[in-house]
Swiss-Prot record:
GO CC terms, sorted: cytosol; riboflavin synthase complex
Binding site for (2S)-2-hydroxy-3-oxobutyl phosphate: 87-88, 128
Assigned EC number: 2.5.1.78
Residue positions binding 5-amino-6-(D-ribitylamino)uracil: 27, 58-60, 82-84, 114
Pfam families, per the entry: DMRL_synthase
Organism, as annotated: Jannaschia sp. (strain CCS1)
UniProt-recorded name of the protein: 6,7-dimethyl-8-ribityllumazine synthase
GO molecular function: 6,7-dimethyl-8-ribityllumazine synthase activity
Enzyme class: transferase
Length: 178
């Protein structure tokens, strides 16, 4: 995720339309509203089409992204939510597992900006959700756009990994086997 930094890459430009899904766990309403406004602002500024998908909690964000990636035509995703430490170890599970799952999806080539806020206090969450302050959601939207631009700069995928259909096996000498 892009965040508060002195390094401003600016927004990438695209020669073909881009479609992004904002996947958010709106557990804390006021924080979620600020996150959505910030992410949408960045995507609108880049003239990028976007849709919003709501899920119950931050643990469901990666699953929703995986489903949407397989079942739709989104070029990238912005993961949003907020996890504030409580009195139990549940915070650690949610923070670690949602981050791990988003990273695993990213390593599979899915363009994701991670804007899930993980903090100790509500004040810290509000500071990070504020589009005029730390703006983690806007930074996540920018990160997703930069990953989409990077992916497009390399052209079409080189091909799928896995088994070829029966009858398409190629032998080293150039012949094929049915």
């Amino acid at each position: 995720m892009a965040g508060h930094s002195d390094n401003d890459l600016g927004l990438p430009s695209f020669d073909k339309p881009v479609k992004v899904a904002i996947v958010i766990a709106p557990y804390y309403t006021s924080i979620s509203e600020a996150q959505l406004a910030a992410a949408r602002g960045v995507l609108d500024a880049a003239d990028v089409a976007h849709e919003t998908i709501e899920v119950p909690g931050s643990l469901e964000v990666p699953t929703a992204i995986g489903i949407a990636h397989r079942m739709s035509n989104f070029d990238g995703f912005v993961a949003l939510g907020c996890v504030i430490r409580g009195a139990t170890s549940h915070y650690d599970v949610v923070v670690n597992e949602s981050s791990r799952a988003l990273t695993m999806l990213g390593l599979q080539g899915i363009c994701i900006g991670n804007g899930i806020i993980t903090v100790e206090t509500r004040d810290q969450a509000e500071e990070r959700a504020d589009g005029g302050r730390l703006n983690t959601a806007g930074g996540a939207a920018e990160a997703a756009l930069h990953l989409i631009a990077l992916t497009r700069s390399y052209g079409a995928p080189k091909g799928a990994l896995g088994f070829k259909p029966r009858g398409t096996i190629e032998i080293a000498d150039g012949s094929s086997q049915a």
